């Protein structure tokens, strides 16, 4: 239980980051409805994470999913000036907040796959695929354990 952590302990800091990254996903998908704009999801994720002083990764984003795993649109996890596309019923999107305990900057290691924070701070990533509907979005990738806890 996060509320039972010792203040300032590494485990407490880690657990809070993980839970808040997860919650930022749910804050974002409150706006994942047909007729809304993509930036509303992005802004909600970023605003929530930044309210705790976290760095929101800007070099990696969520994406559309269709006949290919990674498709347009790109879905940032931070507030943008542009509104982005209007969401349509039937769209499938991978919403994946990536939040750092420290600065938002990341770098790729020599294997061109592993991503680490530039300041060596802790980082968390939470991802699910959603289906846009006229009402609440449908989360397509929740685990059985997550479904039980909701």
Feature locations, PLM:
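Short, structured beta-strand/loop micro-motifs enriched in basic residues and often containing a Trp
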Residues: 70-79
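Residues forming anionic-ligand binding surfaces in small-molecule and nucleic-acid pockets
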Residues: 17-26
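Charged, cofactor-coupling segments
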Residues: 9-10, 79-150
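Single conserved hydrophobic/aromatic residue that forms the stacking wall/gate
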Residues: 1-8, 12-13
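Short alpha-helix boundary/capping segments
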Residues: 16-17, 118
């Amino acid at each position: 239980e996060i509320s039972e952590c010792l203040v300032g302990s590494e485990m407490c800091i880690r657990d809070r980051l993980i839970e808040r990254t997860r919650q930022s996903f749910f804050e974002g998908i409150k706006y994942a409805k047909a007729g809304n704009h993509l930036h509303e999801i992005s802004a909600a994720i970023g605003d929530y994470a930044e309210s705790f002083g976290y760095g929101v990764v800007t070099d990696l984003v969520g994406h559309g999913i269709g006949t290919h795993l990674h498709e347009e649109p790109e879905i940032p996890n931070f507030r943008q000036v542009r509104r982005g596309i209007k969401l349509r019923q039937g769209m499938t999107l991978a919403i994946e907040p990536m939040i750092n305990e420290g600065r938002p900057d990341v770098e790729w290691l020599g294997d061109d796959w592993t991503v680490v924070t530039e300041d060596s701070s802790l980082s968390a990533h939470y991802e699910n695929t959603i289906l846009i509907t006229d009402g609440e979005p449908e989360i397509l990738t929740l685990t059985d354990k997550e479904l039980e806890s909701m």
